[in-house]
Swiss-Prot record:
InterPro entries: L-lactate/malate_DH, Lactate/malate_DH_C, Lactate/malate_DH_N, Lactate_DH/Glyco_Ohase_4_C, Malate_DH_type3, NAD(P)-bd_dom_sf. Pfam families: Ldh_1_C, Ldh_1_N. Keywords: NAD, Oxidoreductase, Tricarboxylic acid cycle. Belongs to the LDH/MDH superfamily. MDH type 3 family. Its EC number is 1.1.1.37. The active site is at residue 176. Catalyzes the reversible oxidation of malate to oxaloacetate. NAD(+) binds at residues 10-15, 34, 96, 119-121. This is Malate dehydrogenase 2.
């Protein structure tokens, strides 16, 4: 049986971690592409030389030509400029749209059957642009945002309650930006609603304040990392999140992962890429799980969807 092939477009911080994680998990042979000569070659050589230590056995190749991604089963796109302190994700749209156009054309030509996961920011616009240019079915072009946003939300909750992150289930909806919707009502610890546990610890009034602070921190979590790094944006957690999506596709795991997916009426949204819970399997984004939202949650979702629509409308 032939091994799967994973193509990574963009050899920066996220791309390097993606290559390492894909190799460590032996998800398939890895091709790392970047326009900078020597960068992807150096990173893949470095990772490959760790194989005898870490015990993985896959092929790793760095390249500066799209032809080398030919026949890839999965393509993960990280290419684009990262944020700097004070920038929003949306500030990147003009320059990263040009980069995504070139990338999508390369994918269309050399990996026409791939499942494409976009990480590049502004995410909701970039995944839309990628699908438009490739012309791939919507179920084969998705964006990584919700897995990361939900993981950040879960981490903050685990730290606050002093429990294992493994026991926290958190859900976020909407766009990957300041208007994302962390769903408190659907968030739990071993099945126990998170607000019950916070109220046991703090009382109702204080619990509400603590949760509001965690929701705010989740929405600004990417910016928090940017402000601390000063020279770039997060790369470990986005890479881990995208690898979870790729693995679910390659192994047909049917995992339910918050994903930037194309909606066709779900959540009252039609014809737009928005973050929602999605079953990811061998068919790509196989189906959307519809959640019943209360009035407050729906209002937040509507606001987030409007922000995504406004952003996508700026695409040339």
């Amino acid at each position: 049986m032939a091994r799967s092939k994973i193509a990574l477009i963009g050899g920066g911080q996220i791309g390097g971690v993606l290559a390492q994680l894909a190799a460590l998990r032996e998800l398939g042979d890895v091709v790392l592409f970047d326009i900078v000569e020597g960068l992807p070659q150096g990173k893949t050589l470095d990772i490959a030389e760790a194989a005898p230590v870490d015990g993985f056995d896959v092929s790793l190749k760095g390249t500066n030509t799209y032809e080398d991604i030919k026949g890839a089963d999965v393509v993960i796109v990280t290419a684009g400029l990262p944020r700097k302190p004070g920038m929003s994700r949306d500030d990147l749209i003009a320059v990263n749209s040009k980069i995504m156009t070139t990338v999508a054309e390369g994918i269309k030509q050399y990996a026409p059957n791939a499942f494409v996961i976009v990480i590049s920011n502004p995410l909701d616009a970039m995944v839309t642009l990628c699908q438009r240019i490739t012309g791939f079915p919507h179920n084969r072009v998705v964006g990584q945002a919700g897995v990361l946003d939900s993981a950040r939300f879960a981490a903050f909750i685990a730290w606050e309650l002093g429990v294992s992150v493994k026991d926290v289930t958190a859900v976020t909806l909407g766009g990957h930006g300041d208007d994302m919707v962390p769903l408190v009502r659907y968030t739990s610890v071993c099945g126990v609603p998170v607000m019950e546990l916070l109220e046991q610890k703090y009382g109702a009034a204080k619990a509400a304040e603590v949760m509001a602070a965690m929701v705010k921190r989740t929405r600004g979590a990417g910016g928090e990392v940017v402000a601390l790094l000063k020279t770039g944006s997060a790369f470990y957690s986005p890479a881990s999140s995208a690898i979870a999506m790729a693995e679910s596709f390659l192994k047909d795991q049917k995992r339910v992962l918050p994903t930037c997916a194309f909606l066709k009426g779900e959540f009252g949204v039609d014809g737009l890429y928005v973050g929602v819970p999605v079953v990811i399997g061998a068919g790509g984004a196989e189906r959307v799980l519809q959640l019943k939202l209360n009035a407050e949650e729906q209002a937040m979702m509507d606001k987030s969807v409007k922000a995504v629509k406004d952003l996508v409308a700026t695409l040339k």
